[in-house]
Amino acid sequence: SINYXNMSNHHMLSTFNLLPVGSNISTWWNFGSMLMTCLALQTITGFFLAIHYTANINLAFSSIMHITRDIPYGWIMQNLHAIGASMFFVCIYIHIARGIYYGSYLNKEVWLSGVILLTALMATAFFGYVLPWGQMSFWAATVITNLLTAIPYLGTMLTTWLWGGFSINDPTLTRFFALHFVLPFIIISMSSIHIILLHNEGSSNPLGTNSDID
């Protein structure tokens, strides 16, 4: 059996494993662990897709067709990655809604780290949406990045810098792919911090009682 007395002496181990939370929590508290499952799924499938993807405006769409048609189990990887992204957002919005309803925002450090995670996730999803370089990808890249031009003085310069030129082109796709590949590792790091902070402070519960009451 697990010796919890010994585990408490190893702070990092106990922080990751032991969550102070009341025994009255419901299904709504499952979505944090479901998000970790989504993150693992997206990282694994994304790695295998990145192996075969070509970040070139003339070849990107063809490389995705190649993945779905010619690569063994490529169609599963592609579909899991696409549907997994949608599930990621379903889970995170339910996770946030539960946090708002039960007052988890009072735990400021955990909440703010979660806000950073949501922002990073939205950025990652946007960059991933552009990668197939279909008609909607081109539209999204143009419209969303054009919002930067609304920034006074610096807007046009920032947009040109992000595009890598005076219009959406090959350099844009290359850097979007690089950002889409790097951001999940930042999300993994931030998730670890989010979990450590949560396990330090303790989770909320439906009755709002102390986390370590039982």
UniProtKB/Swiss-Prot annotation:
CC cofactor note: Binds 2 heme b groups non-covalently.
Kindly list the residue ranges recorded as spanning the membrane: 31-51, 75-96, 111-131, 176-196
Q: Name one GO biological process term.
A: mitochondrial electron transport, ubiquinol to cytochrome c
Residues given in the record as heme b b562 binding sites: 81, 180
Q: What functional role does this protein have?
A: Component of the ubiquinol-cytochrome c reductase complex (complex III or cytochrome b-c1 complex) that is part of the mitochondrial respiratory chain. The b-c1 complex mediates electron transfer from ubiquinol to cytochrome c. Contributes to the generation of a proton gradient across the mitochondrial membrane that is then used for ATP synthesis.
PROSITE patterns xref list: CYTB_NTER
Name-wise, this protein is: Cytochrome b
Give the membrane topology: Multi-pass membrane protein
A cellular component term, taken from the record's GO annotations: mitochondrial inner membrane
The answer to whether keyword Ribosomal protein applies is no
Gene (UniProt)? MT-CYB
Q: In the UniProt entry for this protein, what further remark is given in the free-text comments?
A: Heme 1 (or BL or b562) is low-potential and absorbs at about 562 nm, and heme 2 (or BH or b566) is high-potential and absorbs at about 566 nm.
